[in-house]
Design a protein with these regions (language model features):
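N-terminal Rossmann-like FAD-binding beta1-loop-alpha1 element of flavoenzymes
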Residues: 3-30
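Glycine-rich FAD pyrophosphate-binding loop
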Residues: 22-48
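Short glycine-rich hinge loops at helix-strand junctions in the catalytic core
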Residues: 25, 64, 128
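N-terminal FAD cofactor-binding segment of flavoenzymes
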Residues: 44-86
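Conserved N-terminal helical subregion
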Residues: 72-137
Length: 137
């Protein structure tokens, strides 16, 4: 089979790219050498989170996956910046910013990486224009 676009890498960014191209009508093959770990308690699960700021949330809405994510998203209402530069690796200055000072919306939303992989994999399965082949390199 021929594809318009091949995405090499089925992590969060690769699956997001595949979903975006697929939503635009391109035929897409997304490959990754390993299947995504989609269960929080599975060995090797990525327990970190990713923050999506407002423009990224709009992009996720545009490509059709935000409805799958919104119920799991934690608002990023306060952003704390810490200065730990210099010779000693210690925090010297911190500053907190509250999103309500500039907007009715939070700065963004945090989502667990393992959950993003699960939801993106399920979303790709529902796109007729995208073939997701984990376990392929």
């Amino acid at each position: 089979m021929e594809y318009d676009i091949i995405v090499s890498g089925g992590g969060i960014a690769g699956m997001a790219a595949a979903a975006a191209f697929g939503a635009d009508g391109y035929s897409v093959l997304c490959v990754d050498p390993a299947p995504p770990i989609t269960d929080r308690d599975a060995e090797g699960a990525d327990l970190r989170s990713t923050a999506f700021l407002q423009p990224a949330q709009a992009f996720l809405e545009e490509i059709g996956i935000w409805p799958r994510l919104v119920q799991h998203a934690m608002p990023l209402q306060v952003m704390r910046i810490a200065d730990a530069g210099g010779q000693e690796p210690e925090i010297r200055v911190t500053k907190a910013f509250d999103a309500s000072d500039i907007s009715d919306l939070p700065f963004g939303w945090n989502l667990p990486n393992w959950l993003l992989r699960r939801e993106f994999a399920a979303h790709l399965e529902g796109l007729k224009t995208v073939t997701f082949k984990p376990g392929t390199s």
